[in-house]
Amino acid sequence: LAKSIQASKSSDSTASGTHETSQAQTQVLQWEGVLDEKTKRRLVLGEPVNPSPAKQTIGNYVAIDCEMVGVGPRGTGNALARVSIVNWHGHVVLDTFVKPKERVTDYRTWVSGVRPGDLKKAPSFATVQARVADIIKGRVLVGHAIQNDLRALLLSHPRPKIRDTAGFKPLQELSGNKSPGLRTLSKLVLGIEIQKHKQEHSSVEDAQATMAVFRTQKRAWDELLGIAKKEPVSNTGTAITTTSSAATTGSTKKGQLKRRVSLPSMQARPKAAAAWWEEEVQDYNAQAT
């Protein structure tokens, strides 16, 4: 199904990517064989047809992405309009529109995907802010240029609990850019395309892609941070119920999954996400039978 190549990089690290020089291996997925794009994206991003209760728990790692609209006379000001959070497996924890306090002068639909009707009955900023704060509290927060999201939410998060894929040195070196875009990393690391040209962005897809990139890098990231003991990616608890005023990922119709896929060898899979890959492939094959 997929294999990974490792690029050894000398890099600096902090909680979100910087301080102590060390050797890191950047994991890059390389796809082999014939696999339709839809199935490949589902396996990479994490969109199980019938997710198990374990995959629906919030767990210790969550990824966030926000969409903004324009406010002010020329629409140059930014206001939060949508927030999406996914867990380690890519399962949607929260996906909601947000009603801005200021009058929206530019919905930026071409990139945000937000329309006037989406915000009419959306919850208030304060309501969403409190919900997000509750979800991320005590958890490792993954994001891409995550300070933009935290700034939009008027929230802070402990630096040791932040993983910013835009600031991770091995990924910067892989892309040849100090500020690599999520679209670029998804193509380079995951082998899939998001934020396609002239298509609206989806904060759910962006959050899933960010988590997918992080999954492939987690082991190297932990080594750079000097985390000796592996943190569990999930915890015990009841399955969450996603409450959303936004359209999230669609379900796959029964009978669509026909081709079985084989599990890559341990050497071929990203070590940081080996268990995750095994579960996803098993779920895929179960649906195919």
Model-assigned labels for residue ranges:
Residues 44-52, 120-132:
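A short, well-structured juxtamembrane/interface segment
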Residues 1-59, 232-289:
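N-terminal accessory regions of nucleic-acid-interacting proteins
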Residues 76-80, 87-112, 133-264, 269-271, ...:
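Metal-dependent phosphoesterase core characteristic of DEDDh/y 3'-5' exonuclease domains
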Residues 64, 122, 143-146:
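Short His-Asn-centered micro-motif
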Residues 61-74:
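Short acidic, Gly/Ser-rich segments with clustered Asp/Glu that frequently serve as metal-coordination loops
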Residues 57, 62-64, 79:
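Short, basic and Ser/Thr-rich N-terminal targeting/leader segments
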